């Protein structure tokens, strides 16, 4: 399994808008890609920091997923009021109970 992790610093008062954008944009876009496994959005309501995680069954699916969710991810980042470019990293999941 493979993961894409996006870390964004935004505005605490925009967390709910970011959640809505992630839930209604990023997740459906990711779900449309063969090999999609799961998506998570972690949020710190005090600081406005958000971490989006998508899980994929292969590296190829992760690459296709990046293309599929690019527009929706940009909208979610904008909804959070991010003032900087997010950090995006990719990993192999080496232990999981999913």
Residue locations for each model-derived region?
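Short S/T/G/P-rich N-terminal loop/turn motif that feeds into the first structured element of a domain
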Residues: 1-51, 57-71, 78-98
């Amino acid at each position: 399994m493979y993961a894409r992790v996006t870390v964004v610093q935004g505005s605490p008062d925009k967390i709910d808008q970011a959640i809505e954008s992630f839930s209604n944009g990023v997740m459906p876009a990711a779900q449309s890609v063969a090999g999609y496994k799961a998506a998570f959005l972690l949020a710190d309501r005090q600081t406005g920091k958000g971490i989006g995680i998508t899980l994929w069954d292969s590296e190829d699916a992760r690459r296709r997923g990046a293309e599929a969710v690019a527009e929706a991810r940009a909208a979610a980042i904008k909804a959070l009021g991010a003032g900087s470019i997010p950090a995006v990293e990719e990993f192999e999941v080496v232990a999981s109970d999913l």
